[in-house]
Each structure stands twice: as structure tokens, then as C-alpha cells.
Amino acid sequence: MKRLFALVALVATLVGCAGNSEKVAESPAFDKYNSVVYELNIRQATEEGTFAAAEAYLPVLKDMGVDIVWLMPISPIGVDGRKGTLGSYYSIIDYKAINPEFGTMEDFDKFLATAHDLGLKVIIDWVANHTSRDANWWKEGKKDWYVMDEATGLPIVEYDWTDIAKLDYKNEDMRAAMLDALKFWIEKGVDGYRCDVAMNVPGDFWKRAWEEVRAINPDVYLLAEGEETWLHDSDFDATYAWELHHIFNAMAKGGSETKNVAGDGTIKTDAKSVQDLKDYIARDDEKYPAPAMRLMFTSNHDENSWAGTEMERMGDAHKTFAALTFVLPKGQPLIYTGQEIGLNRRLQFFEKDSVVELVDTEYGKEYRDFYKALCAFRH
């Protein structure tokens, strides 16, 4: 452990000169710039897969040093074209409702209240790009709210997501309904959003949405899945550091093929070195000036289920790269469900699974202590 932190400190010193030295004003209510994010997969975090069961785990996350709990989508899942038995969290019927698989709205409210009592912030995953193919909006006859396939008379399918229907942001009524739904959860006390495939939604929509959301809560935390620079111009606080993630994978494996989860196929990543990492940091600093934050990770729900665990992709170096996500300039570290107990298998995505087999083991405790030390180092 000491040798690991010595390496991290050395790398942080070496790359620190490339980091933007501008100090960001901290909110007295919520220091988002120094926060650690935990992605909570409600379905798989416990045997029950419910808000009530996950609520009992919140004190553990607080003790570990987590600041922001990101909930994967919590809305009801479509049946038309459903993948697997339980379906994809990202195929949504109703933006203002709770997936009964996880519990009731009252269960969610209690989960949120407990998190807030512990000093944790809660953000929810928001899917503004598309709905399920049997969403309420579609059933209500709002055909003009969707991008249509003229050949089939049905909404288009993007990538291989055959269970979704693409929304049309040229329609002002649809925009208004989406904005109303975003404000609904902020008014309930949710602290922000992680926005799925945010780069596929027009920037002018995001900018207006965040103006209205921040009028309700100025301290919301807004994370975009994507690393297009214009997302920061659209008032997102943080974007994904995908390029860095692929550099980590390539450094660990000496060059590998990495699946692009956004659907653009398989890309070849050449072998990378520490110099490539330093070059990236300097380039990233220029491309994303402060106060932009970059979400850094060794795993997330996409990587774990489709590309493999951090142990698969990074081998024995996975802890070193995890440590780097906590110290690199402008980085916002992410911990995904199961990482904090050393889970070394892919979680099922469309079926019930669980990470509980390692929770109470010495092996699991070792990883929890590791991440607790990283969180303390960060703070």
C-alpha cells in the first residue's frame, strides 16, 4: 500500500505542472470539485435489488469517503423489444415514475432522505436521448415527438439498441415535457444528473434545462456521458475521460482492442507509456480549462458488463490505475458497484445478479480499505 501511494504521489508531482493551477471557488454547501462519485447499481448491489436494501448500505459508502451517489436509471422499463428478462435500465416508459422492481416512490424518498441525513448527495441517471418503444409518450399518440423511420412508420433505432425509440429535439412540446420531468426530480430533492449519451442531445436544450434546474437548486452536480468540449459550454460540470480510460487499458496490456460502448465499433489502441499519459494530461488541460471536471474511472456499468472487469483489462496494475483516478489534474474519481469489494466478474445487465458474495470477506475488506484510503487521500 505504501509503495502504491508513493508511486501515485510521484506521478501526481510529475504531471502537476501540466494541471491548471487556477483555484476554483468552492460552494459552501457542496464542494463538488473534490467529490468522489459512486455508481450504485440498485439491481445488483444487494440480493433484494431494492431501494430499501441499498439504503442499508449508504452508511458504508459514507464511511468509505463517498460524496456523490449516482443511481443508474430508476424509472419503469419498457416491454416492447425488452432485452433479457428484466430489461435495460436505459429503456424508459415514464420519466416521472419508479421502476417497481426497485420499490415505490415512498421507498425512493426514504432512500434519498437517509442519504441526505448522512451528508451524501444523490444524482440519478437521465436518459434524454430516447424512451422505450412502448413509452407513455408513444402510447399517447405523440408520434411527432420521435425521429421516425419512414420505411417502418416506427421510431428509429440507434446502434444496436432495439428496445429504444429516438426522441426528436426539433419538437418544442417534447422539449418542454422533458424539461418538466427534469425539474420534477430536482424539486423532490435529487442533487443532479448523470446524462446518458449526452452528446446525442442538442447543446441548446441542455443549456436551457440547466438554467432552469439551477434556478431550483444552484448546487446541482451535472455529469455528461461524453467528452465533447461543447458539453461544458452547455453547462455540464463534468464529462467522461474516455480517452484516458483507454490509455490506462493500453498501458496495462501493451496495446489492446477496446469496444466503444457508444456503438462506433471496435477501435485499436496502440501500446501506451507514461509519456503518453503525461502528453494526454497536458492536452486535456488545454482542451478542458478549469473549472471543467473530468470523470476518471477504471470501471463503470458499461465497461464491467461488456468490456470486462478492471482485473481483466488491467491485470495486476488495476489498483495503480485506480489510484491515478484520484490524483490526476481535474479528475473526479468514480467507483462502480462491486469495485470496493474487489469483484472480479462481469455483472449481468438484463438479469438479476448480485455482488454480495464478497461483502463480508477479508478479501472484500481489503479492497474497501484500499478505496477508503484513496478517498481520504483525495479529501
Each model region followed by its residue ranges:
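Sec-dependent signal peptide recognition
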Residues: 2-8
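C-terminal motif of bacterial Sec signal peptides marking the signal peptidase cleavage site
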Residues: 14-16
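Substrate-binding/active-site clefts of carbohydrate-active enzymes
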Residues: 21-67, 73-188, 208-217, 221
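Active-site-proximal helices and loops of the catalytic beta/alpha 8
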Residues: 25, 112, 196-290, 294, ...
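Hydrophobic faces of well-ordered beta-strands that scaffold small-molecule active sites
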Residues: 36-40, 69-71, 122-124, 193, ...
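Soluble or luminal CAZymes and related metallo-dependent hydrolases
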Residues: 50-53, 103-107, 173-177, 201, ...
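Short, solvent-exposed turn/loop segments enriched in Gly/Ser/Thr/Pro and often Arg
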Residues: 70-84, 125-134, 196-202, 225-229, ...
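Active-site clefts of carbohydrate-active enzymes
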Residues: 288-313
